[in-house]
């Protein structure tokens, strides 16, 4: 029987240093080594979310990490989720259910923090009773000392869990010595003792050239460097936030089916398109440029955390008109979740669920009307699209109800296995659905691409589930080969 290991927390010198991906790698490594790990992030801020099997909502990163660990995702893995709805306000999701909107000042003030702290601590305790080890993830930088008293996710959480903290730094952005040294030295003496190692991430070039740097860092900080993880391009793990979109190509190309995802200001769940990106028949790009939209074969309207605000902006910047013009010229238009709502005749928000805009006309491509509601629908679904016999899978996360225009006979796109219906189908080039993950299903992708078969040559069908498992294994191998794993196990066994 495997010896129980201490929890481990991957803390960061800043945001986007690679904590989430390294956490996924360690989840897979521990699984490979015979443990039963589970991920945990007390508080996550992200627009990318996922529905658990119980129909509750967590951050997508923890769902990915759970998949890497080979365990079902659960709200205890991410008890507190903040979903930004504007520059200053976020929807607060506690234990998988929304409890209201908060601006930054309201959220970070001390009043009410202890209740939230008790909730995230209880979630950790429940998780730790079922799994070992717990692979914890911090948020942003551990050096925001002005927020120390109200922090729920970094060093106070590590102290509660009695976790060994590993500091992750991104050498690719420069200043790695200052960021590591500063992060360590800004901690209290007690917290400083808890930091047991450093991982240098995203290294480019010959690692041997940094050997002297490792010794300097260890001498400066008094903490061992556990590994230098090289930058990679050939491993594909779902990203947590839309920062990765900055590195994706934004224009059409020759010789492929060009699929344009409309780049909304409040775009959410962009992981809906990861499977399409891996299809060798497809070139997928993100844009809000009207000329680039005109070059697409298929336009996808994605999910949005603020649908009415995005609709207002699409009308203001000319993208709405460009989508309608492209559709008249034979381009396929499909909407998912918020994008489905955008395609209807009208969107109403009588109670101000999203904000100050109470009503706007939609694009008018689908004979449906959406009314925003305070209660959120969150669930996993099995479904069949149109008359297709294959069972497909996906999940819903939305706060609106979409109904046919009175007097209109609407054809649903999907029939759910529980007897319900979803979406609206006009023809093969005009449709919408609430189901995230619909484009992870090969049968639906083939149907979507079918009108453009003349552009295609022979291709290999991608089994996306197998592909993702292969990527987790590749990631684990990459991290394992550059990490002092025996020392990490020694630390987590309490023998450091």
Curated annotation (Swiss-Prot):
Pfam families: CbiA, GATase_3
Pathway membership: Cofactor biosynthesis; adenosylcobalamin biosynthesis
Keywords: Cobalamin biosynthesis, Glutamine amidotransferase
Active-site residues annotated for this sequence: 337 (nucleophile), 436
Domain annotation GATase cobBQ-type: ranges: 256-444
Gene Ontology annotations of biological process type: cobalamin biosynthetic process
One Gene Ontology term of the molecular function aspect: catalytic activity
PANTHER family registered for this protein in UniProt: COBYRIC ACID SYNTHASE, DETHIOBIOTIN SYNTHETASE
Similarity-based family: Belongs to the CobB/CobQ family. CobQ subfamily.
General function of this protein: Catalyzes amidations at positions B, D, E, and G on adenosylcobyrinic A,C-diamide. NH(2) groups are provided by glutamine, and one molecule of ATP is hydrogenolyzed for each amidation.
Protein name: Cobyric acid synthase
Gene name of the encoded protein: cobQ
């Amino acid at each position: 029987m495997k010896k129980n290991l201490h929890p481990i927390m991957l803390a960061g010198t800043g945001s986007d240093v690679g904590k989430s991906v390294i956490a996924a790698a360690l989840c897979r490594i521990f699984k490979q080594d015979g443990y039963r790990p589970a991920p945990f992030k007390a508080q996550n801020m992200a627009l990318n979310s996922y529905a658990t099997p119980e129909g509750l909502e967590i951050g997508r990163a923890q769902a990915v990490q759970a998949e890497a660990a080979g365990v079902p995702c659960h709200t205890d893995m991410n008890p507190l989720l903040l979903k930004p709805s504007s520059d200053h306000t976020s929807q607060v999701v506690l234990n998988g259910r929304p409890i209201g909107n908060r601006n930054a000042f309201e959220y970070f003030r001390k009043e009410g923090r202890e209740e939230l702290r008790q909730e995230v601590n209880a979630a950790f305790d429940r998780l730790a009773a079922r799994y070992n080890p717990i692979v914890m993830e911090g948020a942003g930088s551990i050096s925001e000392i002005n927020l120390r008293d109200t922090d729920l996710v970094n060093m106070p959480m590590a102290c509660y869990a009695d976790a060994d903290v590993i500091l992750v730094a991104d050498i690719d952005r420069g200043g790695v010595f200052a960021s590591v040294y500063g992060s360590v030295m800004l901690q209290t003496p007690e917290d400083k003792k808890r930091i047991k190692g450093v991982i240098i991430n995203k290294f480019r070039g010959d690692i041997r050239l940094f050997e002297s740097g490792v010794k300097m860092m260890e001498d400066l900080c008094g903490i061992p460097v556990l590994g230098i993880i090289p930058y990679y391009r050939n491993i594909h793990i779902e990203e947590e936030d839309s920062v990765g979109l900055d590195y994706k190509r934004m224009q059409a190309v020759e010789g492929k089916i060009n699929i344009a995802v409309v780049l909304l200001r409040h775009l959410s769940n962009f992981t809906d398109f990861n499977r399409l990106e891996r299809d060798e028949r497809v070139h997928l790009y993100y844009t809000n440029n009207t000329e680039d939209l005109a070059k697409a074969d298929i336009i996808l309207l994605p999910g949005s955390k603020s649908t009415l605000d995005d609709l207002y902006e699409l009308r203001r910047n000319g993208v709405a008109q460009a989508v309608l013009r492209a559709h008249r010229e034979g381009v396929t238009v499909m909407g998912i979740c918020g994008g489905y709502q955008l395609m209807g005749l009208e969107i109403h928000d009588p109670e101000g669920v999203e904000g100050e805009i109470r009503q706007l006309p939609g694009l008018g491509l689908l004979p449906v009307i959406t009314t925003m509601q305070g209660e959120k629908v969150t669930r996993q679904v099995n479904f069949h699209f149109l008359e297709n016999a294959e069972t497909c899978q996906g999940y819903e996360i939305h706060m609106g109800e979409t109904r046919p225009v009175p007097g209109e006979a609407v054809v649903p796109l999907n029939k759910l296995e529980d007897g319900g219906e979803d979406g609206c189908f006009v023809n093969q080039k005009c449709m919408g659905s609430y189901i995230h993950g619909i484009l992870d299903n090969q049968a639906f992708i083939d149907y979507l691409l079918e009108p453009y078969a003349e552009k295609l040559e022979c291709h290999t069908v991608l089994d996306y589930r197998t592909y993702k498992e292969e990527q987790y294994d590749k990631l684990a191998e990459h991290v394992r080969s550059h990490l002092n794993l025996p020392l990490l196990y020694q630390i987590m066994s309490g023998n450091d």
